[in-house]
């Protein structure tokens, strides 16, 4: 499909002999918001980390199968390039504590030795913070440490850091689980705005959040992709009994 941005083909992930993601096949389109849900230990975060080759950074972790980005297997690409095209935002806000807000935004360039002029850095910082709905709040405090910000602001700073590398796809691993309700609402609003320019894949334990923010939802159980469908359809008439059991709270 011409509109497909990322596709998994028979993707499997392991920690040693532990088979944690099993034969996943899924196609995700450009400018979609995808929720990935399932009980703890079902493989959803491991799958997410496989998309941008972060799974392989864990000792004793291996993978088989393909993850295709724009039709090309990410395992045939330079890993640093892959992680610039596929950004990631983690569960807890993690700005670099010794860097200023300004430096945090361009950290990807600094860490990878990519030379950028001061004028270009200024443009990248303003555009990225604006896209993350943070510029107006911090434009007069760019010299302050990233940890100076509130939890919700720190998470939006981390989103700006991902955006700065001009990715096609942004992965979110339970990005609001450590935030208060007001900050969570701000980040969820941001998801809808980011969809215009990026594809978002969001791992969440919060079924209400999945229903609010996503176009389609993937349900994982015991390492398997059980169901992948339009979010409204999945929540109102799931095709698989295991999905129904999870949604209705029969297991968690």
Question: Where does each model-flagged region fall?
Answer:
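Short helical segment in ABC ATPase nucleotide-binding domains corresponding to the A-loop/adjacent helical element
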Residues: 52, 101-111, 122, 214
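ABC ATPase NBD coupling module
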Residues: 60-62, 73-87, 111, 196, ...
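Conserved ABC ATPase "signature" region
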Residues: 66-73, 118-140
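Conserved ABC ATPase signature
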Residues: 144-149, 153
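Conserved catalytic motifs of ABC-family nucleotide-binding domains
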Residues: 166
């Amino acid at each position: 499909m011409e509109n497909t941005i990322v596709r998994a083909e028979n993707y499997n992930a392991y920690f040693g002999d532990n088979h944690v993601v099993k034969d996943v096949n899924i196609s995700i389109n450009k400018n979609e918001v995808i929720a990935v849900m399932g009980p703890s230990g079902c493989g959803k975060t491991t799958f997410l980390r496989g998309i941008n080759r972060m799974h392989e950074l864990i000792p004793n972790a291996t993978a088989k199968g393909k993850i295709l980005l724009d039709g090309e297997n990410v395992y045939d690409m330079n890993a640093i390039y892959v992680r610039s095209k596929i950004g990631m935002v983690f569960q807890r806000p993690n700005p670099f504590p010794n860097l200023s807000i300004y430096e945090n935004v361009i950290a990807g360039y600094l860490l990878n030795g990519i030379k950028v002029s001061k004028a270009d850095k200024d443009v990248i910082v303003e555009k990225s913070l604006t896209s993350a709905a943070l510029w107006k709040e911090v434009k007069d405090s760019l010299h302050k440490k990233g940890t100076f910000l509130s939890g919700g602001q720190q998470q939006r700073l981390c989103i700006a850091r991902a955006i700065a590398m001009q990715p096609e796809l942004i992965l979110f691993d339970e990005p609001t689980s450590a935030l208060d309700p007001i900050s969570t609402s701000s980040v969820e609003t941001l998801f809808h705005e980011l969809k215009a320019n990026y594809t978002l894949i969001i791992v969440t334990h919060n079924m209400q959040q999945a229903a609010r923010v996503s176009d389609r939802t993937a349900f994982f159980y015991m390492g398997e992709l059980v169901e992948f469908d339009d979010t409204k359809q999945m929540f109102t008439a799931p095709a698989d009994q295991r999905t129904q059991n999870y949604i209705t709270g029969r297991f968690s």
